[in-house]
Regions:
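Radical SAM enzyme core and accessory elements
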Residues: 1-61, 283-373
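Short coil/turn linker and secondary-structure boundary residues
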Residues: 47-48, 96, 150, 173, ...
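Short acidic, gly/pro-rich beta-turn/loop elements at beta-sheet edges
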Residues: 44-46, 82, 152, 178, ...
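Conserved alpha-helical substructure of the radical SAM core
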Residues: 28-162
Length: 373
């Protein structure tokens, strides 16, 4: 056994108290060891590739600055019942009033604010929330399943009120697989939503939630689909969050495996992706990786329509200027709080919690409420 990190912090999966921990390598696997005074000693896997983990783990004990993005959960309501959901509660008491949202916006110093949930389009006053955000000099985005965005008039209303961007979930391009993840085949509605966004908003992201053993084969298909939506689609975000909220099977995928999926889909190697981090062209930690697609060195022949390729000739190496991010979330018994900061893309606030990092919010408030679909 080899100690990779002598001291870090974790959360007890039972009482959620912050506790001391360390990270060790044992027989090629990476384990988090921690001891809660009330609930004893635990060992849980962090990564199955010790060499990979040693290359990407954070060595500085200095906490990085909070990201300049805020995600507000104004509601826990939703208009569908997915088999995977990190906030499966549907408590209307968690709805935030327009005044409460305004107070949050007044305290947030940065311009970019995302509204998620739940499903933000389930709130009848979402257009007013967007208008309020604009009036306070900020750029409003929504994180959505896209079902209501299949309505052209609704998209037009959101655009008129100042919606800046959309992150739309698309977990498969196959109806049967989408039914397994989302509860029903919503593919037609999601594709119509994308068409409407191209007409009215012209800026969106594609988000893919990976479930091990269910939609792994769809990763590359959705990734290449996102590339074909450029220049309207400006980012592709893939994540695996098996220990949060409602899950189909609770099976985890480690970041080394997620990067292998990305590398295979992009036509590069995992070592190429890690080299980008060494060159300062990508960010990487045990839970997340992010880079610009045009820096991956991936071939693009056949990925984009000829008309789009003609427009993108001016872009370096004829590659889409798209942000690519993959996240492999920790389970509740193996969270390294220091490393979660390296994968924290946003701060989070809802009616039940103050502003805090995304991962701390998910694990403290939803990590222990695992449900099988």
């Amino acid at each position: 056994m080899k100690v990779l990190k002598e001291k870090t912090q974790s959360l007890c999966p039972v009482c959620r108290e912050t506790i001391s921990a360390r990270v060790v390598a044992d027989d090629g696997n990476v384990l988090l060891e921690h001891q809660c005074p009330r609930h004893g000693v635990r060992r849980a896997p962090v990564e199955r590739d010790a060499e990979f983990f040693a290359a990407v783990m954070t060595r500085s004990r200095n906490k990085p600055s909070p990201p300049p993005y805020l995600t507000v959960f104004p509601t826990y309501r939703c208009n569908i019942n997915c088999n995977i959901c990190y906030v499966p509660r549907r408590d209307p008491a968690m709805d935030m009033s327009l005044e409460e949202v305004g107070a949050v916006l007044d305290r947030w110093p940065h311009p970019d604010v995302f509204f998620a949930g739940g499903e933000p389009t389930a709130m009848e006053n979402l257009p007013q929330i967007i208008a309020l955000t604009r009036a306070k000099g900020k750029r409003p985005y929504i994180v959505t399943n896209g079902i209501r965005l299949a309505e052209p008039r609704y998209v037009a209303e959101l655009a008129r009120n100042g919606l800046h961007g959309v992150s739309l979930s698309l977990n498969a391009l196959d109806g049967k697989t989408l039914e397994a993840t989302d509860g029903r085949d919503y593919l037609d509605a999601k594709l119509q939503a994308i068409t409407n966004l191209k007409r009215r908003l012209r800026r969106f992201a594609i988000c893919f939630s990976l479930v091990r053993g269910v939609n792994e084969a769809e990763f590359g298909k959705v990734f290449r689909f996102a590339l074909r939506q450029y220049p309207f689609a400006r980012s592709f975000h893939a994540e695996c969050l098996p220990g949060i909220g409602r899950s189909i099977n609770g099976k985890r995928m480690f970041l080394s495996e997620m990067l292998d999926l990305l590398a295979n889909s992009a036509g590069v190697t995992r070592s190429r992706l890690l080299a980008l981090a060494a060159q300062g062209k990508a960010t990487v930690g045990p839970y997340g990786f992010a880079a610009d697609y045009r820096d991956l060195g991936a071939p693009v022949t056949g990925l984009l329509p000829a008309a789009v390729m003609a427009v993108t000739k001016a872009i370096r190496s004829r590659r889409p200027d798209m942000r690519v991010r993959v996240i492999a979330g920790p389970l509740t018994d193996s969270v390294d709080l220091e490393e979660t900061w390296s994968a924290t893309t946003t701060m989070v606030v809802s009616k039940e919690n103050p502003v805090m990092p995304l991962w701390e919010y998910l694990i403290r408030y939803h990590g222990g409420r695992h449900e099988s679909a």
